[in-house]
Amino acid sequence: MKSVMSKIKLFRPVVTLRCSYSSTDQTLLLSEFTRLCYQRDLPRAMKAMDSLQSHGLWADSATYSELIKCCISNRAVHEGNLICRHLYFNGHRPMMFLVNVLINMYVKFNLLNDAHQLFDQMPQRNVISWTTMISAYSKCKIHQKALELLVLMLRDNVRPNVYTYSSVLRSCNGMSDVRMLHCGIIKEGLESDVFVRSALIDVFAKLGEPEDALSVFDEMVTGDAIVWNSIIGGFAQNSRSDVALELFKRMKRAGFIAEQATLTSVLRACTGLALLELGMQAHVHIVKYDQDLILNNALVDMYCKCGSLEDALRVFNQMKERDVITWSTMISGLAQNGYSQEALKLFERMKSSGTKPNYITIVGVLFACSHAGLLEDGWYYFRSMKKLYGIDPVREHYGCMIDLLGKAGKLDDAVKLLNEMECEPDAVTWRTLLGACRVQRNMVLAEYAAKKVIALDPEDAGTYTLLSNIYANSQKWDSVEEIRTRMRDRGIKKEPGCSWIEVNKQIHAFIIGDNSHPQIVEVSKKLNQLIHRLTGIGYVPETNFVLQDLEGEQMEDSLRHHSEKLALAFGLMTLPIEKVIRIRKNLRICGDCHVFCKLASKLEIRSIVIRDPIRYHHFQDGKCSCGDYW
């Protein structure tokens, strides 16, 4: 296919027909062409343009600009090419303003090569010319080209404006580039511009520097909804949900109305902290955007990850439009919350709706099979994903199958599948096998898997802890101590167990061995009372979950202060009986706490939901949604 410039050159040898029109006729012809352009009558305007060209006439730049805008709005690429040829016909040179409009047209048509060729042909370029091209490459994620053009622009002694900087900042992949541009912005006196500050906040957040983003934000005298969204979104994306929510409160106090993008970030923050009450508050703001697909998807995700499946399904069922993200989110949510059969039924509904699954959908389906021990179903979906949906298995799919096989006691098959992976197993894959070894108490294979994980991720404290757990279950205290010594020698610290609970819109954290909570005395008293009552109905501490060689009473005392038990006691103290007690934990719930919560839900007649890094446990009437298969 010929480029636009080669097509233009084909017209240059043509001899222009000398105008046989009178000056009055010329004026009428130009007037008619102008009228048609401003009326956006594209077909008739193109015919009138042919008449102009055949008589060697050209209209003014503003008229052509209107015609080009008409082409852009109608995606009329062919007509746009004809206008470009006309403007360069027989050696004619359009003004810089009009060339910039043409470049913008080709950018809008995603014809960057044609746009750049016109740009290269320009005898002179202004800030609009450069900024249009830089912005185009930045939006198309051709970041290096955008940065190179900025360097050439500066060499050409053209000063960047706020739009140049806001565009090129989003092409920075390293802090050194950002620092350099930030200096240029200050030098040009543009640091107070809202577009520049918004771009700076975005790039700092993208590069994992939210504190720098907050510094830029706090220096602003005034802001707008765009800037607020940038800073809130930045902290939400960097797993700083607490700061994101605090900024959202500041935004509301400042009188700004949250738009879709901001609300999506707020929902992401609530999801990260499992804050159902705050998420519900955000839902109130979303009512006016009830048909916004992205927001509804975020709502479904938030409710699923806060363990409120009724609300998630309500939003899902009320949605008039669903995409693959909607279906995948709901399928994964059901699976993670222990409703595997419902997840697989929803997958069948998804297929019936005509929505094609993607690789994330299949991860959710395999996750459902893994969490319910559906071995035959898991093999079927895994083996058919390529044939039926054209999806090649990736690490996440293999991980689900290894977990499923391991929990089913088929460790040999799990190892065989791991060795047959089409991609290189990573630390997560080996860690999954290690977890299966814990369930099956296979110490030899556990040691092998742990070595693989440590080789790939030597700083991972969780692997050492898991291996130590396996040794402790087998009463191998010398091996437990050896693991601890290795951790000390390498400067690796075990992450302490921490649980969070939301009460009256406030987050309360409980950490094992930490007595800093202002009500810790009352909480401990409540917990001791609960343990005493549970002992009366058959609760016996499972001391094999203690990772220390202690005497019986010491072991029981160690289990007594697990963070989820403290959070549960606090919830029983502070939340009304009709409220579900929702707890988020940073580590996997241990077997003793699992039994404890089942019995507590029956004794206290309460619904308890605990979210750990692996799944959600819904305790009610002495049972758990996981069916003790975890």
Curated annotation (Swiss-Prot):
Residues 429-504 are annotated as: Type E motif. It is found in: Mitochondrion. One of its GO terms (cellular component) is mitochondrion. PPR repeats lie at residues 60-94, 95-125, 126-160, 161-192, 193-223, 224-258, 259-289, 292-322, 323-357, 358-388, 394-424. Residues 505-535 are annotated as: Type E(+) motif. Gene3D superfamilies: Tetratricopeptide repeat domain (1.25.40.10). Keywords: Mitochondrion, Repeat, Transit peptide. Residues 536-630 are annotated as: Type DYW motif. PANTHER family: PENTATRICOPEPTIDE REPEAT-CONTAINING PROTEIN, REPEAT-CONTAINING PROTEIN, PUTATIVE-RELATED. This is Pentatricopeptide repeat-containing protein At2g03880, mitochondrial. It comes from Arabidopsis thaliana (Mouse-ear cress).
